Amino acid sequence: MASTTVAQLAAELSRSAAALLEQLQAAGVGKATPEDIITESDKTRLLDYLKRSHGQADDSARKKITLTKRETSEIRQSDATGKTRTVQVEVRKKRVLIKRDDAAPEHQADGAEAQAHVVDAAEEARREEEERRQAEQLARQEAEAKAAREAAEREEAERRARQEALEAEQRRQAELAARKAEEEAAASRAVTEANEDTSRKKAEDEKARVAAERAEAQKAADEAKAAADKARAEQEIAARKRREAAEAEARAIQQMLNAPARVLKAPSERKAEEKKAEQTGTLHKPVKPAGTEAKPGEKKPVTATATTTTDKKGKVVKAGTSSTWQDEGSRKKGSGLKTRGDSSGGVGGWRGGPRGRGGRQQQHDDSRSNFQAPTEPVVREVHVPETISVADLAHKMAVKASEVIKQMMKLGQMVTINQVLDQETAMIVVEEMGHKAYAAKLDDPEALLVVDGEEHEDAELLPRPPVVTVMGHVDHGKTSLLDYIRRTKVAAGEAGGITQHIGAYHVETDRGVITFLDTPGHEAFTAMRARGAKATDIVILVVAADDGVMPQTKEAIAHAKAAGVPIVVAINKVDKPEANPDRVKQELVAEQVVPEEYGGDSPFVPVSAKTGAGIEDLLEQVSLQAEVLELKAPVDAPAKGLVVEAQLDKGKGPIATILVSSGTLKRGDVVLAGSAYGRVRAMLDENGKATKEAGPSIPVEIQGLSEVPAAGEEVLVLPDERKAREIALFRQGKFRDVKLAKQQAAKLENMLEQMTEGEVQTLPLIVKADVQGSQEALVQSLQKLSTAEVRVQIVHGGVGGISESDVNLATASKAVIIGFNVRADAGARKLAEHNGIDIRYYNIIYDAVDEIKAAMSGMLAPEKRETTTGTVEVRQVFRVPKVGAVAGCMVTDGVVKRNSLVRVLRNNVVIHDGELDSLKRFKDDVKEVKQGFECGLSIKNFNDVQEGDQLEVYEITEVARTL
């Protein structure tokens, strides 16, 4: 028996010798080196130790080893629907091995051997039975595979046979057609030749009948040719029909042959396909057969394709698609996916039937034809507003927004779904997509106002008082004249004795009620006077007899003529010694205002607001003009009017002075004035007394509006507050874009001006006034002060007192706050004092304009002026080391000061312009040298001084500029 070393045993066990030595020592076998001899007893001890350490203490247990072998293959088969499936075939082989223990005691050997024989016999029988079953299964699988291969080979052979038969039939038909054509051509040639021979013989034999025979021969030839052509045409039609039938059969065969072959796929590809199938669809539709195509006689839709082909994978591919994008929707509906809009009753539709029908219903649906009748494209009439988003345009055309975006891309414009298109672009897109585009009118809720106004046109018209506007130049006595009429002293209460608001009053005279509007005469209130002329029936033009026609008088005449109202001229201040009414008449005639005594239509009335002379005549002329005009207005109707003035009161809120033009305004009515609306909470007359209603030509002051309306806005009474709010919000949004566009344009213009003209001084201002008319006039007057060097910037303009928000805005913009007839509250004053904000209060408009003009003058760059102070003649030149040229001079005129500017003249030509460096008399430095004295001087950075040169000494002074 060969001896075994520790190293050899370690090599057999595929272990390292060191690890085996450790295990031997742990088992109690004394081996120290790999060269030591190991015996069978040592191996047994090692085995026992290993069994104990691994948890197997019972040696009597027999070991049983089971071997399982698996073989996997794939077979591709087609089911009844034509879909190809992959079938996995797995073959399992199982084998059990039992290891006997030869080291058992001898007295157990016989029993163990007998038991082993019994076990081996049973195991052998079981293994034989299992091998037999596996052999049968393998044989059955091989038979199935062989049958599948034979079926495929048979199909291939049949396909080849059909293809060859088809080709042979085509060749035979072509040869037959060619042969028939040749035979017919030969027959026709033979007939023609025979006819020619006959005619030639007859021409030689019988010359008399040549013409007749030739005609008959020609007729026979024509008939033969027509018959031949007819036969040829019939043959061509038959050949074309046969060719089309053969091509259709060939396409069907080609489509069948292009079905996927039954090949084995790798498991990874099969898993990927299964995963893709789980992700993409739930229903399957078979490929549409060629026979279901539309017939030539049927009407095809515009977007239908011409041909249908299949790719290598058997999927339907459109060849020759139309140029429109609308094919995608039909292709999506034709796919096997569930789509919410598919209500055609097709197989793939979500409305195809109830869910509980089972597999039979699905199989029946799969066998149903997929052909859908073509439909005509729907042409819609799309009304396109001024602006419309892409999503809204798609909704109007009943298409997806992506279709509109694609069409815009085709037109060369990249848009998003929320991008706004202008009307012209949107109409082009609509027409490109096959619909009809119409320019729609803006959905204007103000159209409701016209309808409401028409409902009350049939109201009874009653006489109304005239509205008389008093206009004229400043300080010509308009308000004083009105005071005498009203028997009040309004003029004494105006700041500076000038009118700065529109005052509306109604006066009861002996000749009826007259409503007066007193307008300011200062040049800044142009817009106010224009509004006064717009609301009036008659204009009283007040001209001072001692002053004559002035600029604002001419402007008032222009406003009155623009409004188309008659003018009554009141020549005021006739009680003054220097009054000259005739000169006033001549000046007014030059302005196209001709008095009645000169043949005109304007009555001239000399009056005196101080003594009251001529007032009655003036009122009589006004009444006569009113009678001529026949002023009437409905009384029992919703009120309409005009905003004469508006302001913001700290306690009452927005307040508007309204002149009612028609209807009756009552407390509690819902009014709309521009973008402001609200319910009339309180109504006061011009004396501050509460009133419940106001009829035509009556001025009132109302409270309860949502904001301060713009002066000159039309006032309407609406039936409910909801409609008023809707129209007001519409008006606010309608002009917001225009306002922003103007602001942006102004910013751009300012930026360009600053870039081109350099840095411009800016005076930022915040203007707050008591009424809107004054604020408007003040802002316009201040903006007129802007020049190319200093510009007035109105940061904010508003109505009402100066608040803390105004001070904060002034702090941020470094602006000066101007308060016109308003004051700052305590919080605003404290905040302004803390932040160093300048707040200026004014009561007279030209005081504010003058002070701002003075401030702007201070911001102007000072003007530099040059003044010659003396003249020096160079008598001698000295060269001093380290100093340069020193000129000995005589002051011939004026005085020379140290550090003065100097010009060097040689032959009356300036050769240098610089500054004196030093000035001495003898050896002493002096500050100045007067005329007639000698001095020595040196010029900074100039040494080319020569005898006979003239030095001109001058200085530059800065002079403040004014606007």
Swiss-Prot record:
Annotated Gly residues bias: 343-356
Renumbered residue ranges of the record's region G4: 572-575
Keyword field contains Phosphoprotein: no
Amino acids binding GTP: 472-479, 518-522, 572-575
InterPro entries cross-referenced by the UniProt entry: DNA-bd_dom_put_sf (IPR009061), EF-G-like_DII (IPR053905), EFTu-like_2 (IPR004161), IF2_assoc_dom_bac (IPR013575), IF2_II (IPR044145), IF2_N (IPR006847), P-loop_NTPase (IPR027417), Small_GTP-bd (IPR005225)
Record carries keyword Nucleotide-binding: yes
Domain named tr-type G: residues: 463-632
Name listed for the protein in its UniProt record: Translation initiation factor IF-2
The organism of origin for this protein: Cupriavidus taiwanensis (strain DSM 17343 / BCRC 17206 / CCUG 44338 / CIP 107171 / LMG 19424 / R1) (Ralstonia taiwanensis (strain LMG 19424))
Taxon lineage: Bacteria, Pseudomonadati, Pseudomonadota, Betaproteobacteria, Burkholderiales
Gene this protein is translated from: infB
